[in-house]
Amino acid sequence: MDKNALRKQILQKRMALSTIEKSHLDQKINQKLVAFLTPKPCIKTIALYEPIKNEVTFVDFFFEFLKINQIRAVYPKVISDTEIIFIDQETNTFEPNQIDCFLIPLVGFNKDNYRLGFGKGYYDRYLMQLTRQQPKIGIAYSFQKGDFLADPWDVQLDLIINDE
C-alpha cells in the first residue's frame, strides 16, 4: 500500500480509539515495556517521547519503574526542519552518547520492523548517526501494522512492542 494512504488510514483508526479502549491498550503496552526493561540493568538513560495524535501514552507505573530503577528519561526536541536532539527536560542537557535505549513512536510498522512515521524523517536521520548499537524499540498498537515497502533511508527497528 502507498505510504501516504496507509498513514492516513492508521491515523484515522488511532484517532477513533475511545478513551477507555486507549487506556486499556496503553496499560498492556506499558506492562510489556516494564517486562522488557526489567532484566536490563545496563539501561540507565532511555529516550522517550511526548505522545501526539493519540500515540501510545506512558502511564504512571512506567514512570515509577524508571524512578525506582534510576533510569533517566530524555525527550526529542526539534531544532530545525530536518533535525531532532534528545534532552533531559529536568536539566535541559543534551548527551546523545549516553542514551542506552530508544522507545520510538510511529504511525505504522511492517512485518520487518520498519517504521512508518509522519514522513519528515527526523528519527531515520537521527538513528542513522548512532555510533553505538542501542536498542531501537517501536511503540505501537497492534492495529498499526501495515503492508508497505521500506525505502533505502528507512531505519529498521530491533523490536516493536504492542498490545499483542
Swiss-Prot record:
Its main location: cytoplasm. GO terms for molecular function: 5-formyltetrahydrofolate cyclo-ligase activity; ATP binding; metal ion binding. Gene3D superfamilies: NagB/RpiA/CoA transferase-like. ATP binds at residues 3-7, 115-123, 125, 153. Mg(2+) binds at D124, D154. One of its GO terms (biological process) is tetrahydrofolate interconversion. GO terms for cellular component: cytoplasm. Belongs to the 5-formyltetrahydrofolate cyclo-ligase family. This is 5-formyltetrahydrofolate cyclo-ligase.
